[in-house]
Amino acid sequence: MIITAIDTNIYDQPEFVEGRDVIGVRFEDLVLDKRIQRVALSGGEELGLRLNHGHPILREGDVLKADDKTVFVVEIIPTDVLVITPSDIHQMGFVAHSLGNRHLPAQFSKPGELTEKAAMIVQYDHTVVSFLDDHDIEYQRTELVPPIPFRHSGHTH
């Protein structure tokens, strides 16, 4: 079966799954924006994705296939990340500038979303850990599903 569009998300329309089993189809963060890919469902059946150009990135809970008994949905595998919580605006600027020079994709959370303080989230990298340790910057290594997939963006100077 070839899927060309995603029309439903179980978090937007929870009533869609009533009376049916929900089975997660696991995706890594790095493939969520790929239009064309093949995935294996439980039981060995393969499902092809051939999404239209400009289609939104796959989200947790997107319905891939459904029948009377079962709904197959996107389940995003958590990503190994560093949640960096600088102590003040000066330290935040230093960290953002230093890691930005490495062209690391980063995301940010407001106080109370992930931690009590505002945080910068980057994918785990042992060199970043060394940098943070060398500069006594507070961080926590954890796994989470980021709200937006991490993407390396090209750049020029």
From Swiss-Prot:
CDD domains: UreE. Keywords: Chaperone, Cytoplasm, Nickel, Nickel insertion. InterPro entries: UreE (IPR012406), UreE_C_dom (IPR007864), UreE_N (IPR004029), UreE_N_sf (IPR036118). It comes from the Bacteria. GO terms for cellular component: cytoplasm. One of its GO terms (molecular function) is unfolded protein binding. It is found in: Cytoplasm. Pfam families: UreE_C, UreE_N. One of its GO terms (biological process) is urea metabolic process. Its main location: cytoplasm. Involved in urease metallocenter assembly. Binds nickel. Probably functions as a nickel donor during metallocenter assembly. Belongs to the UreE family. This is Urease accessory protein UreE. The gene is ureE.
